[in-house]
Amino acid sequence: AGASPRPQGDPESVDQALGLLARAERPIVVSGSGIFWSDAAAELQAFVEQAGIPLYTTPQGRGAIPEDHHLCFLTSRSEAFRETDLIFLVGTRLNYIIGYGRAPRFSAEARMIQVDIDAAEIGRTRSVDVGIVGDAKSVLGQFNKAAAGRLRQSRYAEWVNHLAEIDSQKAPAREKAMSTDQIPIHPLRLCKEIRDFLDRDAILVVDGQEILNFGRV
């Protein structure tokens, strides 16, 4: 027997979600490990590039899109979560890793679109404006087809520039920590040395606690 077809999202819900995105001014996409399980990295990248929406990932979702991509802003994460007016959540649960999607981690006023293959996860820890049950690869494919002509990158340009400016303001302190010769070694210097040594497509396994936080930068 062949593989089971990937479940798609309700077309009306996809259309409703696109309407919210078209009216938003400060949207973000938050993705997680479900992107890998669904083999949806290409669809995710196509979506954020077509729409021009900034992307943030959970620790388990890192690497789906290169983190030096022009729509990824590693050090403006907290500001983006607090200032966003629309959260597009795909491939991740609203669990403790992202503060259950609630304030103060996220803006309490932000609208939310949640895509999950498990219907029980929709709105489990925070109310959502549009919930879409389906496979991440399939649903993102639906968005990519339906978004043509409906989402304009220029609408979010000011928001993207704002997040990029926050990143730029934090860069000097980050670079200073990465180049210091202090003993014991600064965690960011350690991360830089490892990064420079590894190939770009290397797989890195990071444990928890502080090294996870520094490695995120």
Features from the language model and the residues they span:
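Anionic-ligand anchoring segments at beta-strand to alpha-helix junctions in alpha/beta enzyme folds, i.e.
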Residues: 7-10, 16-87, 196-217
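Glycine-rich, acidic loop regions that bind phosphate or pyrophosphate groups
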Residues: 57-162
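Conserved short-loop catalytic and cofactor-binding motifs
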Residues: 2-5, 32, 127, 178-182
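Active-site diphosphate/adenylate-binding microenvironment
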Residues: 164-217
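Proline-rich low-complexity regions
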Residues: 1, 27, 54, 172-175, ...
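Generic structural signal for well-ordered, non-membrane alpha-helical segments
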Residues: 7-10, 14, 33, 37-44, ...
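Cofactor-/ligand-binding subdomain signature composed of acidic, glycine-rich
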Residues: 1-25, 142-152, 157-172
